[in-house]
């Protein structure tokens, strides 16, 4: 399982999931996106980061993980929260034969609408914008203008599990509901009362659903 953190996050976000899955015998790899946050342990500036540079980062991680002798490359799964969920979604769609399944937690498909609401054209985008809680560059917003993210993710035909709280005010539940319609085979599990980010009982419920999903979708020898 390769875990991708969200906007402004680090690999630390994946700790609770990685530990729970590792206790059940799974190999979990968490990493920092290049320029993913001011606290990133990877190289790069937040001004250079975008959905698509993060896709390149994830593709590099996939290639590296596939070369590890203790990893079963036939059972490679992607998991991501927030923007990391969106990155996982487009990356999985670009590599459908390599990725056995995906778990997307409150994936930020909203980012396309946000970019188009902020800027009517590429000419309006400044070199630096303070967005949410950090500075991002022109390269963050420009590729999202008129980007059909649902069309992109629909190329992934294997089973996808989406987990989303119905009290999420950062990424409304409706974006995951639309994703389920776009995917050929996806299931949406709604966590009542959960906001953006899972903790406590919500996190434990999410972990249980992830483990159930993996148990069903692992390719047995």
Regions found by a protein language model. Give the residues of each.
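Alpha/beta-hydrolase fold nucleophile elbow
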Residues: 70-82
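Short alpha-helix in the alpha/beta-hydrolase fold that links the catalytic acid
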Residues: 158, 172-181
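The serine-hydrolase catalytic nucleophile loop
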Residues: 7-19
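Hydrolase active-site cap/lid region
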Residues: 90-139
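Alpha/beta-hydrolase active-site loop
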Residues: 13, 48-68
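Conserved alpha/beta-hydrolase
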Residues: 20-41
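Short beta-strand/loop motif that positions the catalytic acidic residue
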Residues: 156, 162-164, 168
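Catalytic histidine-centered segment of alpha/beta-hydrolase-like enzymes
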Residues: 194-205
């Amino acid at each position: 399982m390769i875990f991708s953190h969200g906007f402004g996050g680090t690999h630390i976000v994946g700790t609770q999931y990685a530990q729970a899955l590792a206790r059940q015998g799974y190999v979990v790899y968490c990493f920092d996106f290049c320029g993913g946050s001011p606290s990133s342990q990877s190289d790069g500036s937040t001004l250079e980061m975008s959905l698509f540079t993060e896709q390149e980062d994830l593709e590099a991680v996939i290639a590296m993980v596939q070369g590890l002798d203790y990893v079963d490359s036939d059972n490679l799964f992607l998991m991501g929260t927030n923007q990391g969920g969106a990155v996982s979604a487009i990356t999985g769609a670009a590599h459908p034969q390599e990725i056995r399944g995906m778990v997307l937690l409150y994936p930020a498909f909203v980012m396309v609408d946000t970019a188009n609401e902020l800027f009517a054209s590429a000419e309006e985008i400044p070199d630096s914008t303070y967005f949410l809680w950090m500075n991002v560059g022109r390269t963050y917003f420009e590729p999202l203008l008129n980007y059909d993210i649902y069309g992109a993710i629909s190329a992934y035909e294997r089973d996808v599990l989406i987990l989303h709280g119905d009290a999420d005010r950062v990424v409304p539940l409706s974006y995951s509901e639309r994703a389920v319609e776009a995917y050929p085979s996806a299931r949406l599990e709604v966590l009542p009362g959960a906001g953006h980010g899972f903790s406590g009982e919500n996190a434990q419920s999410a972990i249980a659903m992830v483990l159930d999903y993996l148990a069903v979708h692992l390719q047995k020898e």
